[in-house]
């Protein structure tokens, strides 16, 4: 966003769900290992960047691929845009091809980014620049990790834990 005296730039590097392994579920909502960045507190972002507000930050409960071991869940982050003419740029991956499962595991959910504007949903590409207007709601969904092994081999205990935690099999 161009503010008085120059540009006000916010940069965030998103991770997502990691793939499952032969003995464990994938990690949920993990930052990219290559970014050396941490999860920034929402309050810090909003105090430093007055052009948006975070209105949702949640796990995508059905984004991890089903399997003997479940792929990690991605997350959703939604921003309410507070000013006109805010430029949003994205450089993402796994928008078209889902993260694959292995040895019978299901794929994780694909990533997506879209803008809700006046009752319309504007789907954005994985690599795109877009101008946001006041009142727009920007939604970023990161992908889930692929599952490992056949879903019917998932232990009863792990299924019970999934149910208790509100995690469902990937149906995306």
Language model features: what each stretch is:
Residues 1-172:
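Glycine/proline-enriched, intrinsically flexible loops and inter-domain linkers
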């Amino acid at each position: 966003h161009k503010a008085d005296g120059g540009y006000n730039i916010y940069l965030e590097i998103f991770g997502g769900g990691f793939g499952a392994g032969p003995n464990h579920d994938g990690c949920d909502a993990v930052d990219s290992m290559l970014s050396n960045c941490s999860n920034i507190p929402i309050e810090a972002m909003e105090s430093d960047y007055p052009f948006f507000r975070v209105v949702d930050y949640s796990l995508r409960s059905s984004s991890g691929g089903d399997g003997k071991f479940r792929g990690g869940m991605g997350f959703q982050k939604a921003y309410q845009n507070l000013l006109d003419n805010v430029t949003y740029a994205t450089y993402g991956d796994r928008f078209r091809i889902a993260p694959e499962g292995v040895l019978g595991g299901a794929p994780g959910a694909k990533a997506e980014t879209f803008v809700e504007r006046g009752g319309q949903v504007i789907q954005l590409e994985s690599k795109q620049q877009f101008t946001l207007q006041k009142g727009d709601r920007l939604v970023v969904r990161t992908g889930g990790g692929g599952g490992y092994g056949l879903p019917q081999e998932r232990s009863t205990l792990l299924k019970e834990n999934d149910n208790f935690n509100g995690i469902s099999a990937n149906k995306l």
